[in-house]
């Protein structure tokens, strides 16, 4: 294996281990789920106008002026 292939394998392994340690057992297995997680921040994460929040959350300002994705209330 060359260096680039080893790097990619290590990156994939680290991503899988990180997902398991974070408790994300219900991660969507389809391609759209992977794409959505890559482009939108989840709940309780900082957000910006260029990166909209994931479905079910919206960008709300906190008292410190920082915007966070918060779960929508029914």
From Swiss-Prot:
Q: Does the keyword Disulfide bond apply?
A: yes
Which GO molecular function annotation, any one, does this entry have?
Answer: potassium channel regulator activity
Where does this chain mainly localize? secreted
Mind telling me which residues the site (Important for the neurotoxic activity) is annotated on? 39, 66
Give each disulfide bond as a residue pair.
Answer: 40-54, 47-59, 50-51, 53-69
**One Pfam family hit:** Toxin_16
Q: Tissue specificity, please?
A: Expressed by the venom gland.
Range of residues in the leader sequence: 1-22
CC per GO annotation: extracellular region
Cellular location of this protein? Secreted
> Which top-level group of life is the source organism from?
Eukaryota
What keyword terms does UniProt attach to this protein? Calcium-activated potassium channel impairing toxin, Cleavage on pair of basic residues, Disulfide bond, Ion channel impairing toxin, Knottin, Neurotoxin, Potassium channel impairing toxin, Secreted, Signal, Toxin
Return the annotated site residues (Critical for the neurotoxic activity): 45-46, 50-51, 68
State which residues form the propeptide.
23-35
Q: What does this protein do?
A: This excitatory toxin inhibits insect calcium-activated potassium (KCa) channels (Slo-type).
User: Record's domain comment?
Assistant: The presence of a 'disulfide through disulfide knot' structurally defines this protein as a knottin.
UniProt lists the family membership as follows: Belongs to the neurotoxin 11 (kappa toxin) family.
In Swiss-Prot or TrEMBL terms, this protein is called Lambda-hexatoxin-Hv1e
| Annotated source species | Hadronyche versuta (Blue mountains funnel-web spider)
